[in-house]
């Protein structure tokens, strides 16, 4: 009986191995080839997809465990008016795993190499959702001549670790874009494939690395220096996501930090999207598009 059980377990393992192998091979099938480009930055290959050809270039970065696929329709809409680029951070989607600590400084270094190797023309309007807001801010501070506008979508704040420290007292989901079990129903087959790539082992390791070094990333962003006076749109959620603990409304703390982002520039504005939670780009895409184009237009007027 024990021998039969061992054989059964062995067959089950072999089946899982075959199923995994078949799934991996399916991802290499030409029908799943993405429309963008694979670009070598020397020590790894990264994926980027740019649409449209009008300046400036809108460059979008997502939150931890987020998916570029969830921004695809927004990118397509924007491309009618402006060049728009989506990319996969190291370990996400079709990009190779990254090297070193997964801090914002590392991410921006890789992104800058990608921009140069892919010969993506500036200037840039940077869009950052959640943790991607760190990328946008750090890049703007480090390369001020190339960045003409920012759009921060329910962005992380460098002080959130301390101002939301009460969350350590309870079990809770990380303050990042959560990965759902199923892709959104309105995703195309291509977008679903992109989405599920972020459930792979390499993507999970990338997400864990970014969470591990979140504190270092926050420090880097806070001390990256001021950005030049440019159009900055701050979009924040209207539907609360955080509890009240020890008599403190953590959601109010979050909103206060969103308002604090207005200090980045004298040419900034704040929009609370009343009917949206954290994933504003999914729940209110038109508001995101409107504000990105507003930043684009203001950046053009400033350049005159």
Region annotations inferred by a language model:
Residues 49, 86-127:
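Active-site loop/oxyanion-hole signature of alpha/beta-hydrolase fold enzymes
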Residues 121-164:
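Conserved hydrolase catalytic core segment
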Residues 266-304:
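Catalytic active-site module of serine/aspartate enzymes centered on a nucleophile-bearing elbow/loop
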Residues 186-272:
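Conserved serine/cysteine hydrolase catalytic core
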Residues 12-20:
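Bacterial N-terminal signal peptides
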Residues 151-180, 190-193:
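Flexible "cap/lid" loop of the alpha/beta hydrolase fold
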Residues 40-94:
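Conserved HGGG/HGGXW glycine-rich cap/lid loop of the alpha/beta-hydrolase fold
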Residues 60-62, 87-89, 153, 236, ...:
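Alpha/beta-hydrolase
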């Amino acid at each position: 009986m024990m021998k039969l059980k061992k054989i059964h377990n062995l067959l089950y393992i072999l089946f899982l191995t075959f199923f995994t192998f078949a799934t991996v091979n399916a991802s290499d099938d030409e029908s799943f080839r993405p429309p963008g480009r694979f670009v070598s930055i020397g020590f790894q290959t990264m994926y980027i997809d740019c649409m449209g050809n009008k300046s400036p270039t809108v460059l979008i970065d997502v939150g931890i465990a987020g998916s570029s696929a969830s921004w695809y329709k927004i990118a397509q809409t924007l491309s009618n008016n402006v060049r728009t680029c989506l990319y996969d951070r190291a370990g996400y989607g079709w990009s190779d795993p990254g090297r070193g600590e997964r801090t914002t400084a590392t991410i921006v270094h890789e992104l800058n190499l990608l921009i140069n190797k892919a010969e993506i023309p500036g200037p840039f309007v940077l869009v950052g959702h959640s943790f991607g807001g760190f990328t946008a801010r750090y890049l703007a501070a480090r390369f001020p001549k190339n960045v003409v506008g920012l759009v921060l979508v329910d962005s992380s704040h460098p002080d959130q670790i301390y101002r939301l420290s009460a969350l350590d007292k309870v079990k809770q989901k990380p303050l990042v874009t959560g990965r759902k079990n199923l892709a959104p129903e309105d995703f195309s087959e291509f977008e679903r494939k992109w989405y599920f790539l972020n459930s792979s082992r390499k993507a999970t390791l990338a997400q864990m690395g970014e969470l591990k070094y979140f504190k270092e990333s926050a420090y880097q962003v806070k001390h990256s220096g001021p950005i030049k006076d440019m159009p900055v749109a701050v979009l924040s959620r209207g539907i609360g996501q955080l509890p009240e603990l020890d008599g403190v409304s953590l959601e109010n703390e979050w909103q206060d930090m969103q308002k604090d982002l207005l200090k980045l520039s004298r040419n900034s504005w704040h929009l609370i999207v009343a009917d949206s939670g954290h994933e504003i780009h999914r729940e209110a895409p038109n508001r995101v598009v409107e504000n990105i184009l507003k930043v684009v237009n203001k950046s053009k007027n400033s350049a005159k």
